[in-house]
Amino acid sequence: GWFKYTPGPVYYDNKNQIVSDKVDECSIYAVLYEEALDKDGNNIVLTGDYKDKEAYIGTSSRVVMRAALENGGEVKDWTEFTASFNLLKDKTYDPSKKYYLAVVCASSAEGDYYQGAPGSTLIVDNLKVTSK
């Protein structure tokens, strides 16, 4: 895909305090995660709730592969990016299991922790996921 990113002018921590030496960064990533069903037979989706380790997309043991933009700093002009999926440590892909794909594009990389710079702007275009 292609992206451009402008961080907001003032970074705040999760206590709404200014962090003067910190500049916001964006985050673009995708994860492949194993299906887990609730009592009604529906997949339990991963979320941004970092307080629930198993439901949180960043820590869930169900995530087996991840692809991510390496540098989330300011990019003024449209820039092409690619990211390859890599198996996480001690994980394997089992073709007999069902998996789900989640794609996250965030203007504040730590926004799920309620930290970032208001006004940060991430624009993504022509995002594609391809398989081999």
Predicted regions and their residues:
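Extracellular beta-strand-rich recognition modules
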Residues: 1-3, 7, 97-107
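Extracellular-facing segments of soluble proteins and assemblies that are Gly/Ser/Thr-biased and enriched
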Residues: 2-38
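Outer-membrane beta-barrel architecture
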Residues: 23-27, 96-101
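Hydrophobic core segments within long, regular secondary-structure runs in both alpha-
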Residues: 27-30, 54, 60-62, 124
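Hydrophobic residues positioned within well-ordered beta-strands of beta-sheet architectures
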Residues: 28, 81, 101, 124-125
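Short, well-structured beta-strand
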Residues: 33-36, 89, 99-102, 110
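Extracellular carbohydrate recognition and processing domains
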Residues: 37-95, 117
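Extracellular carbohydrate recognition
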Residues: 75-77, 93-98, 108-131
